[in-house]
């Protein structure tokens, strides 16, 4: 497995066959300009066999439905993303409209279940393991909004930002069924130890989730872990990487 900033296109193997690549990047917050060659080097060469995973705060399904202007703008942005040849996958962050996301159609995807947002855009459920291009990828979105006091419930903040009991149970069951062995972990926030290594203090409101991720870090065998949320691009350890603008591949 290889993890690097995306740049040169390694699209063909030694026999000249097209190679499928899984790319990973951080929070996009509904910014359509992120999905271009300037901000994602090599993006213009990605094809229908390629996948891009966003580590939460996708942000293109955010506006309350009664905000007609914002909804029109979001539909236009999603229309543009649906024209991309590659598949866009994302875990939930904390700045998402969970009511709208959870009403999306649930479909089988890569051995798990996902929410279909558009024909090529899917929300990956919490606590699932997806097998994508031969890689077992465990997903656990969500985080606590430290700015929730500035937000309006069900207009700019939703309580489903943190996992519920069912999602924790699903995660534990799924990991145990996989003998606690995966290739890649994708989350929005990070384990408590990693948060401290970034120079932050774990928020007590978030401790159930960050504590669970701490357990995952110690109990699960994994090769790479990517997370967003903290708006920094940093290789925290040899195996764990904070993502924001950088694009990494996990061929």
Where are these regions (language model features)?
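Active-site-proximal beta-strand elements of phosphoester/diester hydrolases
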Residues: 20-29, 134-143, 186-188, 241-244
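Structural motif
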Residues: 24, 52-55, 184-188, 226
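Core catalytic region of metal-dependent phosphoesterases/phosphodiesterases
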Residues: 25, 30-132, 200-202, 209-213, ...
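Catalytic metal-binding/acid-base residues of hydrolase active sites
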Residues: 28-29, 58-59, 94-97, 143-144, ...
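Active-site-proximal loop/helix segment associated with metal-binding centers of metalloenzymes
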Residues: 112-113, 117-119, 128, 132-207
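Binuclear metal-dependent phosphoesterase catalytic core
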Residues: 131-133, 214-219, 230-251
